[in-house]
Design a protein with these regions (language model features):
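A structural signal for multi-pass alpha-helical bundles of membrane permease subunits
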Residues: 1-218
Length: 218
């Protein structure tokens, strides 16, 4: 971080440059302003906020099931966050392979939706949506389990009392009982969502197999 405020090379010692490097980056780098910054903002918003909301909704839905079903599905949803980068890359590059052996192309051609295979991971039109989808798929980690634990630990008598006091549906139940009763877990989930959003940039490079990604799309 400190070096970003200096000018240096392999020969001379760093010299303090103030905000010059940042000004140059924001005003002189066309690629950064046109592609990198908008894509980063879009990715952070969708994966960060979207992953946070999705984690809560999935946790709430699982909490409504039986313990056995809940355990199986929770494990299935948490597993992607535990597998390594190599396995995630192999799985999704197999699905979105650009030839007829790719699962996405194979099924779309089988049902007559497309005539020719789509180059999913080469086309900038598809790359960012795929990157976001894979990131959301692998984002059900500690934050998700924390929310699930928070929901399961809410005193059921609160819900019973709320319905006596006038709560009429599940939406009001979530707004007035569930969320206020699990604020620590919600805060922890928010922190983890932010951390995950900034730690998943490797997914784009892994899917594309190169850096930069196609047309700087991811």
């Amino acid at each position: 971080m400190g070096l970003s405020f200096t000018y240096f090379d392999v020969i001379n010692a760093p010299k303090f440059a103030g905000l010059h490097n940042y000004i140059t980056l924001l005003t002189g780098d066309e690629v950064f302003m046109k592609y990198v910054l908008p894509n980063t903002v879009l990715y952070a918003i969708v994966v960060g906020i979207g992953g946070y909301i999705l984690s809560f909704l999935m946790a709430w839905l699982l909490a409504q099931g039986t313990p056995r079903i809940r355990t199986v599905y929770a494990l299935a949803m948490y597993t992607p966050s535990m597998v390594g980068q190599v396995l995630i890359t192999v799985i999704w590059k197999t699905i979105f392979s650009g030839d007829q052996t790719g699962l996405a192309n194979a099924y779309l051609q089988k049902f007559g939706i497309i005539d020719q295979p789509i180059q999913w991971l080469i086309s900038s039109d598809y790359f960012m949506p795929i990157m976001i989808f894979v990131s959301l798929w692998s984002s059900m980690g500690i934050g998700f389990l924390s929310m699930l634990s928070g929901i399961l630990n809410i005193d059921q008598e609160l819900y019973e009392a709320a319905y006596v006091d006038g709560i009429k549906n599940r939406a009001q139940e979530i707004i007035y009982i569930t969320v206020p009763s699990m604020k620590p877990q919600m805060l922890f989930g928010a922190v983890m969502a932010i951390v995950n959003a900034f730690n998943m940039g490797w997914i784009g490079v892994a899917l594309a197999g190169a850096n930069p990604t196609p047309d700087y799309s991811g």
